[in-house]
Amino acid sequence: MLKRTVLAVLSGLAILSTPMVAAEARTLDEILSEGVIRVGINPNFPNMSTRNDAGDWEGFDIDVGNALAEGLGVEVEWVPTETPQRVPFLVSDRIDISLGALTRNASRAMLIDYTVPLHTEVLAVLATSEIEGDSWEDFNEDGITLANMRGNWTVGWIEENMPNVELELVDTLADTVRLVAQGRADAIVENIDFFMAFTENHPDVDWRVVENPIFVAYCAIGVAQGNENLTEVLNILLYGMHSSGMINETWEAHYGSPMLREVVPTPYF
């Protein structure tokens, strides 16, 4: 965990060392007056935000963005925003808010503001009943093969923190789950929420998530720094969406299972 913390700090320093010229963000009054809110979404994030066969956007973030816009009484302008562009697009006023699983961390909070949490990300172990283990450390053994995806940051985390395992890398979420289902890998160590829907493709496998997660991160909506009125209204809308169960129901509809660690709504923010 120490190594991961050091990497996170270095990553944060890299962000802070990158020149970003802050533009004046649109105020809540301007958004309401123009009748449009610009929402940054990942253009290729299955179950979160992607285009369907008809070319329309769909996914968890899309439903959330539409609900927020409805609460504000405005229309949505979807702005494709790749993962590295989320903070720069807020700082440069290309978007009003950023979705796309924007994890809270201190380095980003020096550049942008966050709402209350929207959802969580849980780094955990997805395995089957064919293999024993009550914690992620139990899987750090010779003879264990973990499935993962090329380019995922968790590959580096596994190499540093679970040096005894073998890694089998593929290119998609579905292929990662398939490796375990076919017995070509023993488990997956990842942000497991994003993989759960694909376990339904293999109903004969007795899937299980190791109870103790490695860590839980909170993802919130990114807002331009100092845009307090917009942030406050979004927080109130999110509190209502969490309290009504809309967030959890929408998550389960798109991911096929409940959030592993649900966000507990609080009226204080």
What role is predicted for each listed range?
Residues A25-A101, M110, L169, A253-H254:
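Extracytoplasmic small-molecule ligand-binding "clamshell" domains
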Residues T27, W153-V170, L238-F269:
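Ligand-binding clefts/hinges and TM-proximal coupling segments of bilobed small-molecule sensing domains
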Residues I37-R38, V74-E75, S92-G100, G143-T145, ...:
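Alpha-to-beta junction loops
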Residues P43, H119-A127, I192, M196-Y239, ...:
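Periplasmic-binding protein-like
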Residues D63-G71, E130-I131, E137, N152, ...:
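Extended ligand-binding regions for polar small-molecule ligands
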Residues E77-P88, G133-D134, E168-Q182, A217:
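Short helix-initiation/N-cap motifs at beta->coil->alpha
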Residues Q85-P88, L102-M110, E159-E160, A181, ...:
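A ligand-binding cleft/hinge motif common to bilobed small-molecule-binding domains
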Residues A127-T145:
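Flexible hinge/capping segments at coil-to-helix
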